[in-house]
Amino acid sequence: MLQHILLYLINPLAYIVPILLATAFLTLVERKILGYMQFRKGPNIVGPYGLLQPIADGVKLFIKEPVRPSTSSPFLFLATPTLALTLALLMWMPLPLPHAIINLNLGLLFILAVSSLTVYTILGSGWASNSKYALMGALRAVAQTISYEVSLGLILLSMIIFTGGFTLHTFNLTQETVWLLVPGWPLAMMWYISTLAETNRAPFDLTEGESELVSGFNVEYAGGSFALFFLAEYTNILMMNTLSVILFMGSSYDPTMPQISTFYLMMKATLLTLIFLWIRASYPRFRYDQLMHLVWKNFLPLTLALILWHAALPIATASLPPLT
């Protein structure tokens, strides 16, 4: 009995706490990188080299008074930030790092389904705020997320044809000889751009276009509830990059030293996250019609063509993948 309690209590905590810590320090890394790319220092007052800045920010946000517009929907307004962070953390469960918390047979499908649910948190927060700016930001976010999920789903389908299974562990086994980045580089490029759009990052951050919508769907949020949204966004960024590494740059697994494969995996994920920040510092925001044009008129035909190609090639050459 005690063993079960420890298993179901310590296991989730052992993966939630490091994720939240990584998320907190990712905000610091982002501010530092943006600072140096704009020829300034970034946060450097709190602690040595500003290392305690995320802790100071967290404490400040959570001790602030929870302000709520009087016209907003009380339950939905407070439930959506909590749900956003819960879903963001839930998506980490089937990821093999190198061992998953829950080893699902349809791990990819689970991640895709949960990431689709995050749309409801954005829509709920925008609608519950009872503000036209928040609602416009939420509607934009929903259209953007749903559109890019189409391309993400189709790219995943191509990758599944490569490996012959939905289980994320099979991706590691498939890539023992060569990374799937090599045969599937067009897919990898489209996948990376789609993850940028899916996580509402620059240059696709139309949901929080400061120049037009004040701050987007979270404009009415302050204090703790805003911090939860912030944590959810950055947790999603880390999760998407870790998933990108598992799909395209599979980690080398050593059964005697699983820590080394975890270290390599996180190094690659950190590298991809730094490219996210580099892109944010380098590119201006897309126009809304360009955003939709990119996914529906460029990515969709290309991904469909690649699915046909990847499905037809093994059959034509009689080399079916291992359908485990």
UniProtKB/Swiss-Prot annotation:
Alphabetical UniProt keywords: Electron transport, Membrane, Mitochondrion, Mitochondrion inner membrane, NAD, Respiratory chain, Translocase, Transmembrane, Transmembrane helix, Transport, Ubiquinone
Pfam families attached to this UniProt entry: NADHdh (PF00146)
PANTHER family reported in the protein's UniProt record: NADH DEHYDROGENASE SUBUNIT 1, NADH-UBIQUINONE OXIDOREDUCTASE CHAIN 1
Originating gene: MT-ND1
Annotated localization: Mitochondrion inner membrane
Protein's name in the database: NADH-ubiquinone oxidoreductase chain 1
Family assignment from sequence similarity: Belongs to the complex I subunit 1 family.
E.C. code: 7.1.1.2
Function: Core subunit of the mitochondrial membrane respiratory chain NADH dehydrogenase (Complex I) that is believed to belong to the minimal assembly required for catalysis. Complex I functions in the transfer of electrons from NADH to the respiratory chain. The immediate electron acceptor for the enzyme is believed to be ubiquinone.
Swiss-Prot/TrEMBL catalytic activity: a ubiquinone + NADH + 5 H(+)(in) = a ubiquinol + NAD(+) + 4 H(+)(out)
Any one GO molecular-function label of the UniProt entry: NADH dehydrogenase (ubiquinone) activity
Enzyme class: translocase
GO process terms (BP): aerobic respiration
Organism: Squalus acanthias (Spiny dogfish)
